[in-house]
Amino acid sequence: MSTHNVFFAAKLGDTHRQRFRQHFLRLNASDLHLRFGSSLNGSAVINYVRGIDCEQDEIYAVTDDAKCILGVAHIVVMEQEAELGLSVLAPARGLGVGNTLFDRAVMRLRNRCVSEVLVRCLHQNAAMMHLAHKHGMEIQHDGTDREARLALPAATSGSHMLEWLQDRQASYIGNLQDGSRLGQSLLSAFPVFGMRPAGKKLVKAGSSR
């Protein structure tokens, strides 16, 4: 009997900085260049993680059964506008991790009454451009840079309820994953609302490839 991976984006905070750092340090030089729009060494990555404002910013992550972070969405909110950066580890690309993170970020921003989300990336970041086109973002060209914007609808009681449900489910599924085999059997047996089975201040340019 085949099983399906179920991806969910869980909110992380200040106590997870070590896991953020481990995630970014697993990206190679090319991945870091696409993610941040410039070349970063290990020290710069550590400084970036140290500088994340977990009180004001929003951080969401998709993890595997071993609690390894497969992908991270870092959202910097600036009043009515927010900037989004995505990164996904190479083995998890093409499975929907980036899309899951994008959807969760948009839902959170909508419910925070943010009117527009912005993504900046290099023109060669084909995966991020694909994600931007897929979600109907308006893309502007500026030399080698691309700037994609998406206007967000106003929050409703329904959008707040959906976010609450997804947060509860993310927590529940995370607890199930701690049981590994039992958790996977339960996830395979029951559909999970809002979750998607696997299918084939320095936030620039998330790499979701």
What are these regions (language model features)?
Residues M1-H4, S87, R120-C121, A127-R209:
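Terminal substrate-recognition subdomain of acyl/acetyltransferases
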Residues V6-R19:
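A short beta-loop-alpha structural element at the N-terminal edge
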Residues R26, L34-E83:
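Acetyl-CoA-dependent GNAT
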Residues T63, G85-G94, L122:
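A short, internal acetyl-CoA/4′-phosphopantetheine-binding micro-motif in the GNAT/acyltransferase core
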Residues V76-L86, R93, H141-T144:
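A conserved beta-turn-beta hairpin within the catalytic core of GNAT-like acetyltransferases
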Residues V88, G94-R108, E116, A126-H130, ...:
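Conserved acetyl-CoA-binding loop-helix of GNAT-fold acetyltransferases
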